[in-house]
């Protein structure tokens, strides 16, 4: 049975909050499609969009300023439920006749709100019970302004000692405002609040599921490319692997993948990619063995940025060479995902609704004259992983740690040589193997070895040896914007160190990186 998984959708208007993408993810986790657009979307665009409900997100501006962003008038005239969060609640109050003032006490961090009234939004939601029987909720606050007068027709929904109007509602119109952030995990009942809004008040069905997303994507790809041939650069990373599996299911032999083996991959990675896609799934994969070409161009180059540019440019040259050998290819497939779309639009214009028509990831030549097919461009990373599993990809492939585009080229400090790459490949493989054996691989967000181009003295038997240093790096993070070094057990680190020094010729010392981000970045270069 075919479902229109976009028919019921929640429109999220972004006023610049760092949490806006979290709102979209929370709605989708419930099983309903949501999309982020800029706050200045026109009234006609909103009416044409036909949302099932609208969420006004937070933002850094002050609604007390005359030039502050305002929600389009159509938001309140459309007749659909509206949820205002933080700044969204404040602009709702101002635009409907209420009042907002700067608060003498800024609230940032944990707070406890007291529920009031009989709103459908907070019905039966509580973390604790007050002495008078009122529901108390543990929430996350982040605001400097506060609503001091509710618009006519609104009732009090929540309060804190320093913010007497921390929530308001108009049940007849299904308008709700909360000063706190239900999208962050610190607000313990945030998911239930979104479920009440999306499933009950907006009356949406749970159609946004991995199986339905796959079905919808296959249908769209077939409509888009018809009987044309499609080319995909397969890296072995999560996004390109999921695109390969999805396109193969959609169009079969019309897909050709090019896998560029640059000599800077992890141990056995090239063989694993070929086994998975060419051997097991029957995907047509061309493997371009370009190790000597890449290492030749990198000889004598130590600057990290120059190394990146050489690796990126050489990849394009190899890919272009393979592409010109193929006949009648009209489409280029890419693993663009939704955060790429949002971020590139925001970077170009400051507005999330100007979606790029050509997301030229990796800087592929403009004169290649391919049309673009991007089957993941609506999806967040966690959704990409979910549909990867739905398509039958192995869990370890779908949930593998991130690997930089330049590969080991930026994990070898300074000049890249084959000797260094071979040593690093073995050290990295030992580290990851032991992490998996100790059940630590999926507890860390990213783990890898780094080759340091310095020699250190070591003692083996009766002899001294002067050899290379390997540093191990493992971090825990939610968003990769900040990260904490992983507190791995000493016994595990000792085992990894002993194996690397004993099993790899040319290594005399192993260190563990205990730097967090910031100030250090996750990768060394």
Curated annotation (Swiss-Prot):
Keyword ATP-binding included in the entry's annotation: yes
GO terms for MF: ATP binding; GMP synthase activity
Domain Glutamine amidotransferase type-1: 9-207
CDD domains attached to this UniProt entry: GATase1_GMP_Synthase (cd01742), GMP_synthase_C (cd01997)
Active site: 86 (nucleophile), 181, 183
Claim: Nucleotide-binding is one of the keywords in the record: yes
UniProt-recorded name of the protein: GMP synthase [glutamine-hydrolyzing]
């Amino acid at each position: 049975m075919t479902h229109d998984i976009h028919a019921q959708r929640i429109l999220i208007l972004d006023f610049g909050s760092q949490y806006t993408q979290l709102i979209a993810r929370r709605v989708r986790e419930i099983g309903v499609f949501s999309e982020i657009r800029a706050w200045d979307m026109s009234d006609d665009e909103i009416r044409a969009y036909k949302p099932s409900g609208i969420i006004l997100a937070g933002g850094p501006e002050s609604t007390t300023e005359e030039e502050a962003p305002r929600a389009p008038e159509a938001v309140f005239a459309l007749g659909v439920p509206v949820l205002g969060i933080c700044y969204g609640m404040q602009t709702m109050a101002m635009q409907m006749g209420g009042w907002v003032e700067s608060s003498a006490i800024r609230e940032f961090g944990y707070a406890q709100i007291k529920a009031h009234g009989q709103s459908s939004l907070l019905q039966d939601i509580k973390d604790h019970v007050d002495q008078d029987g009122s529901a108390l909720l543990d929430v996350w606050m982040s605001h400097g302004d506060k609503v001091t007068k509710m618009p006519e027709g609104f009732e009090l929904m929540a309060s804190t000692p320093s913010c007497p109007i921390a929530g308001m509602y108009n049940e007849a119109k299904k308008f709700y405002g909360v000063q706190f952030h239900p999208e962050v995990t610190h607000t313990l009942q945030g998911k239930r609040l979104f479920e009440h809004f999306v499933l009950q008040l907006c009356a949406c069905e749970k159609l946004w599921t991995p199986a339905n997303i796959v079905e919808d994507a296959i249908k769209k790809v077939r409509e888009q490319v018809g009987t044309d041939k499609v080319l995909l650069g397969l890296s072995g990373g999560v996004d390109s692997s999921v695109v390969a599996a999805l396109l193969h299911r959609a169009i079969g032999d019309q897909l050709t993948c090019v896998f560029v083996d640059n000599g800077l991959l992890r141990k056995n990675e090239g063989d694993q990619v070929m086994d998975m896609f060419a051997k097991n799934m029957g995907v047509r994969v061309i493997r371009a063995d370009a190790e000597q070409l890449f290492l030749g161009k990198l000889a004598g180059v130590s600057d990290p940025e120059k190394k990146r540019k050489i690796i990126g440019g050489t990849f394009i040259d190899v890919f272009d060479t393979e592409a010109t050998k193929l006949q009648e290819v009209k489409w280029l497939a890419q693993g663009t995902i939704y955060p790429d779309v949002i971020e590139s639009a925001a970077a170009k214009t400051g507005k999330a609704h100007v979606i790029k028509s050509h997301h030229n990831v990796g800087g592929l030549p403009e004169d290649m004259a391919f049309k673009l097919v991007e089957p993941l461009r609506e999806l967040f990373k966690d959704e990409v992983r979910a549909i990867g599993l739905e398509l039958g990809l192995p869990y370890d492939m779908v949930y593998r740690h991130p690997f930089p585009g330049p590969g080991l080229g930026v994990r070898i400090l300074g000049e890249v040589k084959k000797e260094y790459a071979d040593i690093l490949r073995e050290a990295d493989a030992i580290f990851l193997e032991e992490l998996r054996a100790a059940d630590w691989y999926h507890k860390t967000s990213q783990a890898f070895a780094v080759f340091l181009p310095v020699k250190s003295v070591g003692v083996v038997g009766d002899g001294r040896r002067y050899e290379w240093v390997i540093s191990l790096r493992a971090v825990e993070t939610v968003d990769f914007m900040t990260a904490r070094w992983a507190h791995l057990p000493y016994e595990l680190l000792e085992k990894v160190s002993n194996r690397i020094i004993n099993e790899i010729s040319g290594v005399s010392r192993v260190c563990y990186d205990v730097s967090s981000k910031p100030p250090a970045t996750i990768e060394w270069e």
